[in-house]
Amino acid sequence: MSLELLSQLETKIQATLENIELLKMELEEEKQKSTQLAEKNQKLQQDLNSWSDKVNGLVGLLNSEI
């Protein structure tokens, strides 16, 4: 291989490595977002269950008064 080809190869390898590092950082950000969304989803599910229990309790009171 000529020196020029080796230089081009080195440039392409360096660019690829930089791209891989950027993708790793993006992946880490997406993992963090996913974790945050999972936590938010769990909180919303708990809120929904709480409200559902309250509504069912009120419906039960209404039914017992009828």
UniProtKB/Swiss-Prot annotation:
One of its GO terms (biological process) is FtsZ-dependent cytokinesis. The lineage of its organism: Bacteria, Pseudomonadati, Pseudomonadota, Gammaproteobacteria, Alteromonadales. Non-essential, abundant cell division factor that is required for proper Z-ring formation. It is recruited early to the divisome by direct interaction with FtsZ, stimulating Z-ring assembly and thereby promoting cell division earlier in the cell cycle. Its recruitment to the Z-ring requires functional FtsA or ZipA. It comes from Shewanella denitrificans (strain OS217 / ATCC BAA-1090 / DSM 15013). Belongs to the ZapB family. This is Cell division protein ZapB. One of its GO terms (cellular component) is cytoplasm. The gene is zapB. Pfam families: ZapB. It is found in: Cytoplasm. Its main location: cytoplasm. The keyword Transcription regulation does not apply. It comes from the Bacteria. Keywords: Cell cycle, Cell division, Coiled coil, Cytoplasm, Septation. Residues 3-59 form a coiled coil. Homodimer. The ends of the coiled-coil dimer bind to each other, forming polymers. Interacts with FtsZ. InterPro entries: Cell_div_ZapB (IPR009252).
